[in-house]
From Swiss-Prot:
UniProt keyword Repeat, yes or no: yes
Protein name: Uncharacterized protein C03B1.10
Stretches forming Sequence repeats: 9-12, 13-16, 17-20, 21-24, 25-28, 29-32
Keywords: Repeat
UniProt organism field: Caenorhabditis elegans
Lineage: Eukaryota, Metazoa, Ecdysozoa, Nematoda, Chromadorea
Region named 7 X 4 AA tandem repeats of W-M-D-G: 9-32
């Protein structure tokens, strides 16, 4: 129970961290790409 609980917590933490990181990375990448090509969302 303790191990599975810890793994579940780690999975949720990693999922949230990856989601936020990917969102921020994509936002920054797309924003930079849009600016470099003069594209507005």
């Amino acid at each position: 129970m303790e191990v599975s609980g810890r793994l579940g917590w780690m999975d949720g933490w990693m999922d949230g961290w990856m989601d936020g990181w990917m969102d921020g990375w994509m936002d920054g990448w797309m924003g930079g790409l849009g600016r470099s090509e003069g594209i507005r969302d």
